[in-house]
Swiss-Prot record:
Changing residue 211 to E: Risk factor for CRS5; results in gain-of-function. SUPFAM superfamilies: Homeodomain-like. Expression is likely to be restricted to bone. Found in parietal bone. Binds DNA. GO terms for biological process: anterior/posterior pattern specification; digestive tract development; embryonic digit morphogenesis; embryonic forelimb morphogenesis; embryonic hindlimb morphogenesis; embryonic skeletal system morphogenesis; hair follicle development; muscle organ development. Belongs to the paired homeobox family. The keyword Aminoacyl-tRNA synthetase does not apply. GO terms for cellular component: chromatin; nucleoplasm; nucleus; transcription regulator complex. Transcription factor involved in skull and limb development. Plays an essential role in craniofacial development, skin and hair follicle development. It comes from Homo sapiens. This is Homeobox protein aristaless-like 4. Residues 94-106 have a biased composition (Pro residues). The gene is ALX4. Residues 214-273 bind DNA.
Length: 411
């Protein structure tokens, strides 16, 4: 300290504070409340020494006034020019009470907290996991020599932040040991016993299916019961409830069994009807498309039969064309036919030399018209359908006789 500072400490503290909080300098309008001293003395030794003396070396009253002044000095800086009146503590109060503005919260100045002397303190520190439980707490000395860490062993995996810390107990250790230990052969644990007691899914499904449906024994009807049921079915396929009950009483059956029998009987009847209709359709189409085909021997026998042409078969030129012994030009000679219509002669030739059957004659006759088929074809009449049938039967009989004669001659 210099000499001026020592002299300033010897001054009266009350005079210095009165000069600082002088109401004369604050009563002027527009003047700053911080200008209690002249501009040259603001940072002088007198102001600084007075403030230091009031804070550290003054009496209690001076320190209280100085502390209140410090708060009032901070208030105008925060709230603005409207709070200047609160800085002046010596402003006379008016006689009439004025409405006071709502008190504004004053920010608390953060005072530096005095730190106590450094003392060694204990704090919990989580040690490395998977340490064997030893039941002892280890005290570690820090590098500074005034702090120590209390190491607590853990028995589980490292947990993330926010997970609750589980204290080690005998159950957890026992569970881990039983899980990590090798199971002996033939020894079942509690979980194995529980799983063996529970049924498998397949067995459970089978038991549920058996419980869900009851298999009914097949009803065997006697001949008397079947006869009575068939009698009623012949009358009606759909008996009503009253008829079924009467039938059940006669046959010593239940009404439900009678109803089921009629359902099955109707299904069987529909199946038979459908099968019968299919058979009828098949037989109808098979008979409709079958054609009476004659063999070559039958055709030759019909042509050689004299009754096929008429009485005067010897004078007819047709056998000359059919029989292979006669020459073919005899059929084509112009003098072979007696004078007659050319259309009738052409029709006669085509009908005989075509297929040699009645089908060719009928078609060719219809082709040339009814006029060509005159009652006498070259003086000969054509026999009807019954003659052809009898001729075919006669030919078959002749064949049978020839066959029997050949067999008898061979023996």
């Amino acid at each position: 300290m210099n000499a001026e500072t020592c002299v300033s400490y010897c001054e009266s503290p009350a005079a210095a504070m009165d000069a600082y909080y002088s109401p004369v300098s604050q009563s002027r309008e527009g003047s700053s409340p911080f200008r209690a001293f002249p501009g040259g003395d603001k940072f002088g030794t007198t102001f600084l020494s007075a403030a230091a003396k009031a804070q550290g070396f003054g009496d209690a009253k001076s320190r209280a006034r100085y502390g209140a002044g410090q708060q009032d000095l901070a208030t105008p800086l925060e709230s603005g020019a409207g709070a200047r009146g609160s800085f002046n503590k010596f402003q006379p109060q008016p006689s009439t009470p004025q409405p006071q503005p709502p008190p504004q919260p004053q920010p608390q100045q953060q005072q530096p907290q005095p730190q106590p002397p450094a003392q060694p303190h204990l704090y919990l520190q989580r040690g490395a996991c998977k340490t064997p439980p030893d039941g002892s707490l280890k005290l570690q000395e820090g590098s500074s020599g005034h702090s120590a860490a209390l190491q607590v062993p853990c028995y589980a995996k490292e947990s993330s932040l926010g997970e609750p810390e589980l204290p080690p107990d005998s159950d957890t250790v026992g569970m881990d040991s039983s899980y990590l230990s090798v199971k002996e052969a033939g020894v079942k644990g509690p979980q194995d016993r529980a799983s063996s007691d529970l049924p498998s899914p397949l067995e459970k499904a089978d038991s549920e299916s058996n419980k869900g449906k009851k298999r009914r024994n097949r009803t065997t009807f006697t001949s008397y019961q079947l006869e009575e049921l068939e009698k009623v079915f012949q009358k009606t396929h759909y008996p009503d409830v009253y008829a079924r009950e009467q039938l059940a009483m006669r046959t010593d059956l239940t009404e439900a069994r009678v109803q089921v029998w009629f359902q099955n009987r109707r299904a069987k009847w529909r199946k038979r009807e459908r099968f019968g209709q299919m058979q009828q359709v098949r037989t109808h189409f098979s008979t409709a498309y079958e054609l009476p085909l004659l063999t070559r021997a039958e055709n030759y026998a019909q042509i050689q039969n004299p009754s096929w042409l008429g009485n005067n078969g010897a004078a007819s030129p047709v056998p000359a064309c059919v029989v292979p012994c006669d020459p073919v030009p005899a059929c084509m000679s112009p003098h072979a036919h007696p004078p007659g219509s050319g259309a009738s002669s052409v029709t006669d030739f085509l009908s005989v030399s075509g297929a040699g059957s009645h089908v060719g004659q009928t078609h060719m006759g219809s082709l040339f018209g009814a006029a060509s088929l005159s009652p006498g074809l070259n003086g000969y009449e054509l026999n009807g359908e019954p003659d052809r049938k009898t001729s075919s039967i006669a030919a078959l009989r002749m064949k049978a006789k020839e066959h029997s004669a050949a067999i008898s001659w061979a023996t």
